[in-house]
């Protein structure tokens, strides 16, 4: 009432109406995304305003691309997207977990319980679940020689939730090998050193790992070689063309001879830089060696002519992000001047060749020694397939990186959620005094949304599945769900593992957002940018 006195145009939802609006919004977003969860999840088709179509089952992509107007749903979506930004996965799980927490809370609130009591129970349950997670995790030793098999299992688990089984299994080796390629002991893993390049060509199963680099342009001279072996590679950021001064300078001449002399001097300056590169080539190259110049700046036609005459391959306008990758892949160093070129500045590659696809040219730099950068070359018959594979590969790379940094994994297939629920009900609930027990119970039951949704998406009976899993856990057996037949399965033997950091972030963020939403007792649309114009 007081808000309406201050602003007659304000829209206000009070107490139970506000609470039920937030709960319904959370449940609505949950219903949209829950069918995507797991290997048996379905695909959503997003149609844009201009008619463009996007096919995806990646929760992060859906939440970013969808137009969400409800404020509660926007808040949940931002939390889920932040989950992906931090840990690389768990977007869909976050949304359905928050939705289930709200759904479980609604039952208690409808029976007269105050939301504050539930929030207190959520906080107790969250702390207990995080402590249980630390005891439940499986340590993985990540020294100089990493356990490649466990990394493959984690990557396979992630990729199978995004792609069909055959392609996911093929990409598993590619993803693991690419992360191990760029990994340096005692240093953080920089996934930007893995170039993800795509070619609209052939089929998705033709996707491969290139231990080197693929540049999305070719040489600009018809006489340059299209294939060369045993290549010395000069990575440089030097202008091999006439360019204007960076300061606002002008030149004046009084006759044509002076102008001609000035043009000749400018040309001579560029030619001298090119000749220094040619001198280095003659110094280091034997009869069977070749020389490649990859320049971030331009190379003009006369300079290309000089290089081509000496059998040098010249690539210009290389992207800035590829300069660091080239040095890591091929060795040597990127130079900003040709004045003091030495053989130590050069990298090496066993094979450099150009591939032409339609009007596009690609240059492959392969057979490098000890690469610390690589390229995942994604192929597919159409843009929809390529976009799906890209999303999956990015999630796969993050899952492998997380495993190496966490040095532990968590049993998947819903095993952790069922075990945590049993722990909360059988151990933690007894230690809680008063009505906060109901908050702990609601939190415990909300954890079951993951195995329930996995079973539902696989076409299984959810009640039978949950009863079967909980009875096994009561016997002391840690089991997950076999999506093929609905029977309990040992995730460790089946090789189904989740990331520890993803689970931890999920348990941390879910109850916090749910608690904030439960404590909303008024929704007021009266902000300055929302106010309706008055006459």
Swiss-Prot record:
Coiled-coil annotated residue ranges, if any: none
Molecular functions per Gene Ontology: ATP binding; ATP hydrolysis activity; ATP-dependent protein folding chaperone; unfolded protein binding
Keywords: ATP-binding, Chaperone, Cytoplasm, Nucleotide-binding
Gene Ontology cellular-component annotations: plastid
Locations listed in the record: Cytoplasm
Pfam families membership: Cpn60_TCP1
PANTHER family in alphabetical order: CHAPERONIN
Family: Belongs to the TCP-1 chaperonin family.
Function, in words: Molecular chaperone; assists the folding of proteins upon ATP hydrolysis. Known to play a role, in vitro, in the folding of actin and tubulin.
Subunit text: Heterooligomeric complex of about 850 to 900 kDa that forms two stacked rings, 12 to 16 nm in diameter.
Protein name per Swiss-Prot or TrEMBL: T-complex protein 1 subunit zeta 2
Species: Arabidopsis thaliana
């Amino acid at each position: 009432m007081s808000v309406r006195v201050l602003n007659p145009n304000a829209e206000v939802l009070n107490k139970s109406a506000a609470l039920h609006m937030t709960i319904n919004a959370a449940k609505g977003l949950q219903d949209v995304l829950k069918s995507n969860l797991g290997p048996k999840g379905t695909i959503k088709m997003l149609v844009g305003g201009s008619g463009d179509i996007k096919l995806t089952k990646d929760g992060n992509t859906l939440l970013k691309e969808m137009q969400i107007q409800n404020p509660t749903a926007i808040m949940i979506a931002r939390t889920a997207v932040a989950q992906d930004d931090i840990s690389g996965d768990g977007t869909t799980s976050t949304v359905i977990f928050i939705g289930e927490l709200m759904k479980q809370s609604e039952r208690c609130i409808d029976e007269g319980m105050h939301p504050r009591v539930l929030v207190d129970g959520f906080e107790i349950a969250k702390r207990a679940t995080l402590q249980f997670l630390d005891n439940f995790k499986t340590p993985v030793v990540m020294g100089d020689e990493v356990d490649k098999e466990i990394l493959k299992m984690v990557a396979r688990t992630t990729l199978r939730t995004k792609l069909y089984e055959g392609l996911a299994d093929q990409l598993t080796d590619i993803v693991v090998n690419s992360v191990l390629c760029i990994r340096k002991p005692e240093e953080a893993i920089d996934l930007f050193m893995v170039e993800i390049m795509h070619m609209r060509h052939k089929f998705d199963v033709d996707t491969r790992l290139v231990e080197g680099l693929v540049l999305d342009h070719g040489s600009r001279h018809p006489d340059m070689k299209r294939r060369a072996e045993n290549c010395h590679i000069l990575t440089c950021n030097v202008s091999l063309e006439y360019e204007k001064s960076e300061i606002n300078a002008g030149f004046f001449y009084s006759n044509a001879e002076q102008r001609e002399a000035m043009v000749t001097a400018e040309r001579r300056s560029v030619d001298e830089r090119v000749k220094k590169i040619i001198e280095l080539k003659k110094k280091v190259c034997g009869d069977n060696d070749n020389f490649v110049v990859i320049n971030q700046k331009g190379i003009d036609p006369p300079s290309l002519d000089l290089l081509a005459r000496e059998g040098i391959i010249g690539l210009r306008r290389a992207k800035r992000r590829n300069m660091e990758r080239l040095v890591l892949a091929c060795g040597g160093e990127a130079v900003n001047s040709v004045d003091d070129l030495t053989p130590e500045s050069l990298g090496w590659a066993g094979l450099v060749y150009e591939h032409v696809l339609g009007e596009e040219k690609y240059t492959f730099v392969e057979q490098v020694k000890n690469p610390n950068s690589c390229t995942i070359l994604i192929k597919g018959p159409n843009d929809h397939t390529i976009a799906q594979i890209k999303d999956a590969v990015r999630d796969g790379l993050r899952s492998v990186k997380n495993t190496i940094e966490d040095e532990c994994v968590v049993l998947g297939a819903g095993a952790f959620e069922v075990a945590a629920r049993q722990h909360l009900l059988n151990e933690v609930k007894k230690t809680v005094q008063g009505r906060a027990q109901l908050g702990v119970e609601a939190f415990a039951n909300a954890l079951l949304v993951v195995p329930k949704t996995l079973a539902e998406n696989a076409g299984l009976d959810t009640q039978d599945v949950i009863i079967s899993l909980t009875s096994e856990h009561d016997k002391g057996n840690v089991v997950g769900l076999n999506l093929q037949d609905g029977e309990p399965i040992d995730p460790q033997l089946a090789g189904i593992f989740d990331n520890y950091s993803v689970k931890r972030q999920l348990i941390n963020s879910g109850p916090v957002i749910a608690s904030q939403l439960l404590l909303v007792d008024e929704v007021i649309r009266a902000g300055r940018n929302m106010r309706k114009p008055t006459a």
